[in-house]
């Protein structure tokens, strides 16, 4: 077997080759929702924006499923290849693909069956509900395709082809972007047009991803590779649980935030719908930055996983620290944009009255104040997943959302009203950053002693 370049190539080159396509692919998940929101905001108004925000948890749950199986199987593949166990790698990949399909179909059926109940739980108000139901009932059709595409993109990167992974995701986004204005404005389908454009783009990406099954180079499939094995499935899910649990926590905090904003917003001059619409815009804007961080972390995973499996700990340390530097550059640019140009960013998502822009600007500046450090927690969680310490990775992934943000979102508004919801973000970001630095520092010191 040819020696894998992950074990000897310069780390900076590997990170560039793997992370940049991963960033592009990761951005697509955010772009699907943001492009819809921009066109829907222009065509339908802020109630349309609020509707896509209420439906957004469906996308984050979908991504959580894709990460559970995709990251889990890809991490297993990288570790097995690093240990020179090609048959085990093929089994991990094959079982991962089967799980993606099964989970995708189950998710579609559950979502469509309980749609009205779920939308109300997500915070849909009386005025927003009809738009949200129309949008979500259509976009749920594309969720199984999105799960397989996102999951497969991780396996394709583990196979050493990050550029093809990027192409799969980007082409779907291009189709979506082209169809959005046609369906919304030319065909006059409104919010349904944005939903159908999203689904068609997702199906296109799915077809491209599925074609790669016959192109794997480091993985050689046999029929047995696709026979579902319970033990292997458990290993896959255990390795993907940290990334997935973070997304689940994102979904939970979205639901809590939406309900808190409508409750406390009703007690202010902003009302219920303005905070709901503004929150979604701020979150989806921040999702672009988080997608870049996720892309960097996904790009480092094969590098860290392979070299940890090969016991080349100095390369593990180098890859992690370089990824942190990349993250700080991105976060600095984001901080400047969010603090100095918030109204320009918010205006992209459609018009609104003076109160709408007043609250949206306040939300962006306050909630995203600690964007400089909030990516370190994601990188650190991914780091532990890549080296096979999935429990520690899962716990770290949950720190910001579950241990800090959810309690703060529930408690701070009791003292500060609607401002408490906004202040919860930066406090949680800083707390998670400190914990991440401590845990990774201990692990890197341990690896250094084992060299």
Annotate each PLM feature.
Residues 61-64, 176-180, 206-210, 288, ...:
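Hydrophobic transmembrane alpha-helices of multi-pass small-molecule transporters
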Residues 17-36, 138, 172, 201-205, ...:
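Transmembrane helical elements of multi-pass membrane transporters/channels
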Residues 12-31, 35, 58-65, 141, ...:
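Residue-level signal for short hydrophobic patches within transmembrane helices
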Residues 49-109, 146-165, 258, 278-342, ...:
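Small-residue-rich hydrophobic transmembrane alpha-helices
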Residues 70, 139-157, 165-173, 194-207, ...:
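Short runs within selected transmembrane alpha-helices of multi-pass transporters and secretion channels
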Residues 31-50, 119-126, 182-189, 251-282, ...:
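Helix-terminus/linker motif at the lipid-water interface of multi-pass membrane proteins
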Residues 1-22, 77-142, 186-241, 304-370, ...:
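Short alpha-helical transmembrane segments in multi-pass integral membrane proteins
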Residues 22, 26, 38, 42, ...:
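Transmembrane alpha-helix boundary and packing residues in multipass membrane permease domains
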């Amino acid at each position: 077997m040819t020696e894998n370049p992950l074990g000897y190539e310069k780390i900076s080159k590997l990170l560039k080759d793997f992370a940049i396509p991963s960033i592009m692919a990761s951005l697509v998940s955010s772009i699907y929702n943001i492009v819809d929101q921009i066109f829907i905001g222009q065509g339908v108004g802020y109630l349309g924006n609020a509707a896509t925000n209420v439906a957004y948890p469906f996308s984050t749950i979908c991504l959580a499923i894709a990460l559970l199986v995709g990251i889990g199987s890809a991490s297993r593949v990288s570790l097995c290849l690093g240990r020179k166990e090609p048959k085990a790698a093929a089994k991990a990949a094959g079982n991962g693909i089967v799980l993606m399909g099964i989970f995708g179909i189950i998710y579609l059926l559950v979502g469509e069956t309980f749609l009205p109940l779920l939308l109300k739980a997500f915070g849909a108000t009386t005025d927003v509900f009809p738009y949200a139901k129309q949008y979500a009932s259509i976009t749920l059709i594309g969720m199984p395709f999105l799960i397989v595409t996102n999951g497969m993109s991780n396996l394709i990167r583990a196979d050493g082809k990050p550029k093809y992974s990027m192409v799969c995701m980007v082409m779907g986004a291009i189709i979506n972007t082209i169809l959005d204005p046609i369906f919304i404005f030319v065909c006059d389908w409104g919010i349904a047009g944005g939903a159908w454009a999203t689904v068609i783009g997702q199906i296109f990406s799915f077809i491209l991803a599925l074609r790669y099954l016959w192109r794997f180079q480091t993985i050689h499939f046999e029929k047995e590779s696709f026979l579902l094995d319970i033990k292997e499935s458990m290993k896959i899910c255990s390795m993907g649980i940290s990334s997935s649990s973070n997304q689940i926590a994102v979904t939970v905090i979205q639901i809590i935030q939406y309900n808190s904003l409508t409750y406390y917003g009703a007690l202010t001059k902003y009302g219920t719908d303005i905070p709901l619409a503004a929150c979604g815009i701020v979150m989806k804007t921040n999702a672009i930055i988080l997608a870049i961080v996720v892309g960097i972390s996904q790009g480092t995973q094969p590098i860290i996983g392979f070299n940890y499996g090969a016991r080349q700990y100095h390369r593990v340390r180098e890859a992690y620290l370089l990824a942190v530097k990349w993250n700080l550059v991105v976060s600095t640019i984001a901080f400047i944009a969010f603090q100095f140009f918030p109204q320009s960013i918010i205006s992209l998502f459609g018009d609104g009255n003076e109160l709408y822009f007043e609250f949206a600007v306040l939300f962006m500046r306050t909630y995203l104040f600690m964007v400089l450090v909030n990516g370190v927690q994601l990188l650190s969680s991914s780091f532990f997943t890549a080296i096979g310490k999935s429990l520690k990775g899962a716990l770290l992934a949950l720190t910001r959302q579950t241990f800090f943000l959810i309690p703060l979102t529930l408690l701070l508004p009791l003292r500060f009203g609607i401002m408490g919801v906004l202040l919860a973000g930066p406090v949680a970001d800083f707390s998670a950053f400190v914990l991440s630095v401590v845990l990774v520092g201990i692990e890197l010191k341990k690896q250094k002693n084992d060299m």
